[in-house]
């Protein structure tokens, strides 16, 4: 007896060896995919009729700050320095642990409802984000943000907390939580500190999550301080490797791209955040052409302002067509790979495609909508027409988190109301 059978679906496997099924069945047992075919002889406790829908791998959001849902729309359309110094940083200074839990739970709710099944997060009070992930049923790679600012005492305290978090939560939530070390960026951490963090990560067998060359200001500051850019500094201290998740990577030279390729660094492309903050356009087309593993992330809600990865998918596809002057750049299936296969590789999860033996993280997208009719090409529709709100069912680790638009793992109204109250009180404290 299987646990779940999804039948009558268009099965978008994202498996290059298998292809898609126009009318197929997916069987789930003990948290894994056990069968994919036109039909099955199995019976199951739960049968989902997905007629008129697409079943596909869940999406991976490879860079966000979940608790920043509390800052959604708080300070928009400002210069970066003013945005940070006068609004975001003063508000963050007032954060309490319970705020981070409520903001993270709201983020998890939003992701469940829009098709994201795994995410990578870097922030503060990360025990609270981990608790939210545990409660929500999602999969996550979590890191405590380390911002040393050339202050040895602060750096030691941050690293101690980062190490504690990594060891406390690795493999928690039945293996759904992985932990990473999160040095903020090369322009906020000294090279000595970055080296220490890398050594600790190696000792713990943990990955590294870091911002790299998000802005031209970072590029200029690094050249002034070190005579080299962030990528070359990280390369020179032996920081890079397949265990590194580098967010943004906007201001890259061709030489930087070659280093990322050689070291098998995973890149998280955050096009909407980069556009909203006018940070620039990452050379994603070049990176993909060179074989760099490029994934997609939303960044935090303060600079997006939502966690809908379908928006990120469409934006990435369009942005790099216009920026390269090439309408064939980043075709639909390639962008879907960035959000699924590539994301799973970056996060080290056995997900990202529908294949027997893989973990059962998947979503059902309802195609019976006016804006999805008619449908001549499913991948194209998912990229250029679909929205997060078209996701009707979300499954992680073989557990149904949302069924036919109804979230099963939390009280949606309560989560929204508590987050709204926490955000209002937080901003009031910041402005007092």
From Swiss-Prot:
Zn(2+) binds at residues 63, 65, 211, 299. Signal peptide: none annotated. Its cofactor is Zn(2+). Substrate binds at residues 92, 184, 214, 299. The keyword Transcription does not apply. Its EC number is 3.5.4.41, 3.5.4.31, 3.5.4.4, 3.5.4.28. One of its GO terms (biological process) is S-adenosylmethionine biosynthetic process. Pfam families: Amidohydro_1. One of its GO terms (molecular function) is S-adenosylhomocysteine deaminase activity. It catalyses: 5'-deoxyadenosine + H2O + H(+) = 5'-deoxyinosine + NH4(+); S-adenosyl-L-homocysteine + H2O + H(+) = S-inosyl-L-homocysteine + NH4(+); S-methyl-5'-thioadenosine + H2O + H(+) = S-methyl-5'-thioinosine + NH4(+); adenosine + H2O + H(+) = inosine + NH4(+). Binds 1 zinc ion per subunit. Keywords: Hydrolase, Metal-binding, Zinc. The keyword Zinc applies. It is an enzyme of class 3 (hydrolase). Pathway: Amino-acid biosynthesis; S-adenosyl-L-methionine biosynthesis. InterPro entries: Amidohydro-rel, Deaminase_MtaD/DadD, Metal-dep_hydrolase_composite, Metal_Hydrolase, MTA/SAH_deaminase. Homotetramer. Catalyzes the deamination of three SAM-derived enzymatic products, namely 5'-deoxyadenosine, S-adenosyl-L-homocysteine, and 5'-methylthioadenosine, to produce the inosine analogs. Can also deaminate adenosine. The preferred substrate for this enzyme is 5'-deoxyadenosine, but all these substrates are efficiently deaminated. Likely functions in a S-adenosyl-L-methionine (SAM) recycling pathway from S-adenosyl-L-homocysteine (SAH) produced from SAM-dependent methylation reactions. Belongs to the metallo-dependent hydrolases superfamily. MTA/SAH deaminase family. SAH is a product of SAM methyltransferases and is known to be a feedback inhibitor of these enzymes. As a result of this inhibition, organisms have evolved efficient enzymes to metabolize SAH via different pathways. The pathway found in methanogens differs from the canonical pathway, it uses the deamination of S-adenosyl-L-homocysteine to form S-inosyl-L-homocysteine for the regeneration of SAM from S-adenosyl-L-homocysteine. 5'-deoxyadenosine is a radical SAM enzyme reaction product which strongly inhibits radical SAM enzymes. This is 5'-deoxyadenosine deaminase.
């Amino acid at each position: 007896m299987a646990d779940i059978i999804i039948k009558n679906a268009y099965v978008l496997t994202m498996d290059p060896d298998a292809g898609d099924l126009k009318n197929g069945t997916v069987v789930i047992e003990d948290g894994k995919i056990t069968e994919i075919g036109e039909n099955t002889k199995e019976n199951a406790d739960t049968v989902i009729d997905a007629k008129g829908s697409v079943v596909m791998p869940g999406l991976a959001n490879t860079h966000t700050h979940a608790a920043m849902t509390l800052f959604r729309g708080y300070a928009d359309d400002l210069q970066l320095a003013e945005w940070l110094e006068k609004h975001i940083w003063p508000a963050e200074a007032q954060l309490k642990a319970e705020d981070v839990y409520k903001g993270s739970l709201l983020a998890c709710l939003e992701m469940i409802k829009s098709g994201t099944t795994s995410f990578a997060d870097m922030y503060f009070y990360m025990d609270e984000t981990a608790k939210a992930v545990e409660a929500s049923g999602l999969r996550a790679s979590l890191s405590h943000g380390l911002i040393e600012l050339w202050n040895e005492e602060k750096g030691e305290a941050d690293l101690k907390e980062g190490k504690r978090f990594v060891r406390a939560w690795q493999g928690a939530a039945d293996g759904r939580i992985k932990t990473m070390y999160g040095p903020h960026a090369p322009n906020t951490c000294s090279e000595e500190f970055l080296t220490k963090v890398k050594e600790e990560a190696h000792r713990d067998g943990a990955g590294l999550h870091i911002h790299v060359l998000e802005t031209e200001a970072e590029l200029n500051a690094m050249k002034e301080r070190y005579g080299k850019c962030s990528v070359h500094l990280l390369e020179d201290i032996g920081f890079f490797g397949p265990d590194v998740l580098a967010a943004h990577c906007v201001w890259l030279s061709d030489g930087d791209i070659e280093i990322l390729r050689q070291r098998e660094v995973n890149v998280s492309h955050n096009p909407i955040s980069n556009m909203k903050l006018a940070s620039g356009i990452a050379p994603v087309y070049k990176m993909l052409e060179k074989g760099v593993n490029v994934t997609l992330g939303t960044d935090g809600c303060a600079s997006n302002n939502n966690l809908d990865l379908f928006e990120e998918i469409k934006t990435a596809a369009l942005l790099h067509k216009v920026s390269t002057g090439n309408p064939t750049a980043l075709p639909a299936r390639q962008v879907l790979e960035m959000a699924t296969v590539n994301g799973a590789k970056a996060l080290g999860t056995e997900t990202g495609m529908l294949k027997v033996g893989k973990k059962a993280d998947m979503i059902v997208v309802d195609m019976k909508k006016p804006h999805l009719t008619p449908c001549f090409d499913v991948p194209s529709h998912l990229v250029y027409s679909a929205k997060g709100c078209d996701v009707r069912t979300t499954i992680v680790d073989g557990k149904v988190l949302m069924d036919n638009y109804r979230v099963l793992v939390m009280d949606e109204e309560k989560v929204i109301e508590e987050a709204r109250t926490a955000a209002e009180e937080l901003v009031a404290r910041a402005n007092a």
